[in-house]
Amino acid sequence: MNMLLEINDLNSYDIEFIFDTAIQHFNNSNVSNNSLYGKTIVNLFFESSTRTLSSFEISAKSLGARTVTINVSTSSMNKGESIIDTVLNINAMNPDLIIIRSQYSQFIKEISKYLPNCHIINAGDGHHEHPTQALIDYCTIRYIKGKIHNLNISICGDILHSRVARSNIRLLSRYGANISIVAPPTLICNLKGVSHIHHNFVEGISDSDVIMLLRLQKERMTNFTISSEEEYAYLYMLNSENLSYARSDVIVMHPGPTNKGVEISHYVAEKKSIILLQVKMGVAVRKAILEYLLCHN
């Protein structure tokens, strides 16, 4: 395997290797090695990112790789160069791996057909997939709970526009999780692997082992999908009161960025969630993914 474009690119062996390696890195987060010494990794992000871009940079550099991050706002795209030509020109410089984020669903899969000999990671494409975030969430849940099978996992928020939801549902359902999606009717779509659909928030999180919250992706909303953020928060924000309906050992997750006071209260985000642990796990998981693609294939 030389590309990670969708979560279904990974078989059980791949995922087990990534999990085991990630946990080693997580438990030894202050230890650097040179497993990627001499490798050049290009970050090509056509869409805004804080956590994902920083996480990949830190992961690559801590493994000894050289990283090149392209500032798209000052690239030749401003002179009329197409996205495809930009990627092809970067590839012609023979990097060992290109990490791409795009606002266009399926774009990275399409461009990969022109780059058969290049290692590529999909760092998020439109509302299609975000496979590395799903692996981070899988590893985080398994690290804390010890398993995925038979866990009640509620994914709440803007399901319709969420690449994180799609990748997580595909991965977690494969390992036997009972997945509920919780959202207003206008932010729901039919996805294979979902056990239950709820429009009532309390019903959707009742008896949950894991609550995964998603922000409203207003930048992708083209139609009238919610009346207001205030009404959405009133009906769908996780707070200390409705959190009591979940299991006592529930873990609260969020892939970021969070909009506190909309999908999650300040108190729950800061006192009851494992959001920062997810971020720490993100570096460990991305180290494992980079090593798997560049050292074990």
Curated annotation (Swiss-Prot):
<dbReference type="InterPro" id="IPR036901">
    <property type="entry name" value="Asp/Orn_carbamoylTrfase_sf"/>
</dbReference>
<dbReference type="InterPro" id="IPR006130">
    <property type="entry name" value="Asp/Orn_carbamoylTrfase"/>
</dbReference>
<dbReference type="GO" id="GO:0016597">
    <property type="term" value="F:amino acid binding"/>
</dbReference>
<feature type="binding site">
    <location>
        <position position="257"/>
    </location>
    <ligand>
        <name>carbamoyl phosphate</name>
    </ligand>
</feature>
<comment type="subunit">
    <text>Heterododecamer (2C3:3R2) of six catalytic PyrB chains organized as two trimers (C3), and six regulatory PyrI chains organized as three dimers (R2).</text>
</comment>
<keyword id="KW-0665">Pyrimidine biosynthesis</keyword>
<keyword id="KW-0808">Transferase</keyword>
<feature type="binding site">
    <location>
        <position position="130"/>
    </location>
    <ligand>
        <name>carbamoyl phosphate</name>
    </ligand>
</feature>
<feature type="binding site">
    <location>
        <position position="101"/>
    </location>
    <ligand>
        <name>carbamoyl phosphate</name>
    </ligand>
</feature>
<feature type="binding site">
    <location>
        <position position="133"/>
    </location>
    <ligand>
        <name>carbamoyl phosphate</name>
    </ligand>
</feature>
<feature type="binding site">
    <location>
        <position position="163"/>
    </location>
    <ligand>
        <name>L-aspartate</name>
    </ligand>
</feature>
<dbReference type="GO" id="GO:0006207">
    <property type="term" value="P:'de novo' pyrimidine nucleobase biosynthetic process"/>
</dbReference>
<feature type="binding site">
    <location>
        <position position="256"/>
    </location>
    <ligand>
        <name>carbamoyl phosphate</name>
    </ligand>
</feature>
<dbReference type="GO" id="GO:0005829">
    <property type="term" value="C:cytosol"/>
</dbReference>
<dbReference type="InterPro" id="IPR002082">
    <property type="entry name" value="Asp_carbamoyltransf"/>
</dbReference>
<feature type="binding site">
    <location>
        <position position="52"/>
    </location>
    <ligand>
        <name>carbamoyl phosphate</name>
    </ligand>
</feature>
<dbReference type="GO" id="GO:0006520">
    <property type="term" value="P:amino acid metabolic process"/>
</dbReference>
<comment type="similarity">
    <text>Belongs to the aspartate/ornithine carbamoyltransferase superfamily. ATCase family.</text>
</comment>
<dbReference type="InterPro" id="IPR006131">
    <property type="entry name" value="Asp_carbamoyltransf_Asp/Orn-bd"/>
</dbReference>
<dbReference type="GO" id="GO:0044205">
    <property type="term" value="P:'de novo' UMP biosynthetic process"/>
</dbReference>
<dbReference type="InterPro" id="IPR006132">
    <property type="entry name" value="Asp/Orn_carbamoyltranf_P-bd"/>
</dbReference>
<protein>
    <recommendedName>
        <fullName>Aspartate carbamoyltransferase catalytic subunit</fullName>
        <ecNumber>2.1.3.2</ecNumber>
    </recommendedName>
</protein>
<dbReference type="Pfam" id="PF02729">
    <property type="entry name" value="OTCace_N"/>
</dbReference>
<dbReference type="Pfam" id="PF00185">
    <property type="entry name" value="OTCace"/>
</dbReference>
<feature type="binding site">
    <location>
        <position position="79"/>
    </location>
    <ligand>
        <name>L-aspartate</name>
    </ligand>
</feature>
<dbReference type="GO" id="GO:0004070">
    <property type="term" value="F:aspartate carbamoyltransferase activity"/>
</dbReference>
<comment type="function">
    <text>Catalyzes the condensation of carbamoyl phosphate and aspartate to form carbamoyl aspartate and inorganic phosphate, the committed step in the de novo pyrimidine nucleotide biosynthesis pathway.</text>
</comment>
<feature type="binding site">
    <location>
        <position position="51"/>
    </location>
    <ligand>
        <name>carbamoyl phosphate</name>
    </ligand>
</feature>
<feature type="binding site">
    <location>
        <position position="215"/>
    </location>
    <ligand>
        <name>L-aspartate</name>
    </ligand>
</feature>
<comment type="pathway">
    <text>Pyrimidine metabolism; UMP biosynthesis via de novo pathway; (S)-dihydroorotate from bicarbonate: step 2/3.</text>
</comment>
